[in-house]
C-alpha cells in the first residue's frame, strides 16, 4: 500500500514543474486510516499562473504516478465552508513547499 512517504516523494518531484507554492495532504492518508480504496486528498496553494487546464493536467500526472485517484482543493482556507475547513485543518500535513 502507498505510504505518506511515497506520496511526499512523488509530490516533491512533480510540483516543481507547476505554479504551486505549497501542498498539504489531508483526509485518510494524513490521518493514517486509509484503505485500499482511499483517494488522496491534497490542498494546494497555487500561484496566479495556475489555470484549470493546468490543474487538470497536474491531477492526471499525480494519479498516474501514485496509482490512485487524487482530489485537489485550491480554495484558500478562508474561502471554504467552516465545517469543511475545520475538517481539513484538523489533519492536514504540509508535504511540499516551493523553494
Question: Where are the language model's segments positioned?
Answer:
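Short beta-strand->loop micro-motif that forms the acidic, two-metal-ion catalytic signature
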Residues: 41-44
